[in-house]
Structures are given as C-alpha cells and as structure tokens.
C-alpha cells in the first residue's frame, strides 16, 4: 500500500488493515476467497497488486502481512519478498526476490548482482531513475536480460521496485 488504508478479509480467517508501507503476501494455492475494501470515501487507496506464478501447483493457501519502514529502503535495496523469507522479507513459493528502494539526488549507486540466467525487472513507482544506463520516469519499467547486474543511479525522488527473477517459471499445462 502506497497511500490510504485497505481492509482485507479472506476465507482462511485473516482480517486486517493495510496501511502505507505494508506488504501483503497471499498464496491462492488450492483456493481462497478474499476481499479488499477501502472504507474511507474521502481518501483513495494507492497500491500495487503483483501476481507471480508459484514454482509448483497444489500448495496450500497462505497469508502474511508485514510493515516495511520508509527508513529501511532509503538509499538501499530493502528485501520485501523472497523464497526463503531471509533478511526480514516475506516468504513466497517462487524463485523471485523483490526489493524496494527510495533514492534521491546524491545517493550512491545501488547494485543487485544477477546470477547467471536470472533476469531483473525494475518498476518505477514515483520520480525518475537511471537503470543500467536507461532513464525512466514514474510508471515506467525496465527488463534486464543477459546482464550480470542491475545498477540504479541518479534517482530523483525515486520510489522503485526491483525484481530478481529466477529461471524456472511454472509451465502451464
């Protein structure tokens, strides 16, 4: 959630309110019913909903929610979600690591090494940023393929997500 508040309810019994800085990880697995609702008619919700395919089928449904402070991503890559739930991130059933950053003018470069065969993807939520030499503005994204790292620099009030994507997507059958 980027702005506003969103109330969550699901068929597994989870309820809660998501606020700015909160990240929710929901695994549909074998099935779950859920709803998200903004109860405040005067304050819109600004959020991102990101769907990732799991590494395998038939996993049980799951839910987790965590708050990530703005200070934790200022001028650094803050882990939000990864397969092992390491470094304070939420765990996920996919070979993906998702990081967030807030960068501004004068910040040092941020680098994410990509293991052989992995891809990077950067989504710029707000501001402006240079990614591997390509200047992007709010709402833009860059796919990084065939390179060994992702380099973020020259941020201007930049709020970005960086995805480190694995090599084994779920094959549709």
Predicted regions and their residues:
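Jelly-roll (double-stranded beta-helix
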Residues: 1-173
């Amino acid at each position: 959630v980027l702005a506003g508040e969103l109330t969550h309810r699901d068929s597994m019994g989870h309820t809660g309110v998501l606020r700015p800085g909160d990240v929710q990880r929901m695994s549909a697995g074998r099935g779950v019913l859920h709803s998200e609702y903004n109860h405040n008619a005067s304050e819109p919700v600004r959020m991102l909903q990101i769907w990732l395919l799991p590494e395998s089928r038939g996993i049980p449904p799951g839910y987790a929610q965590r708050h990530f402070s703005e200070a934790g991503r200022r001028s650094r890559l803050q882990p939000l979600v990864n397969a092992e739930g390491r470094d304070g991130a939420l765990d996920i059933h996919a070979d993906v690591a998702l990081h967030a950053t807030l960068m501004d003018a004068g910040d040092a470069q941020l680098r994410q090494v990509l293991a052989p065969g992995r891809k990077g993807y950067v989504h710029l939520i707000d501001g402006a940023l240079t990614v591997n030499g390509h200047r992007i503005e709010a709402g833009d994204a860059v796919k990084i393929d065939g390179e060994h790292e992702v380099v973020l620099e020259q941020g201007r009030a930049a709020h970005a997500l960086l995805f480190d994507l694995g090599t084994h997507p779920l094959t549709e059958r």
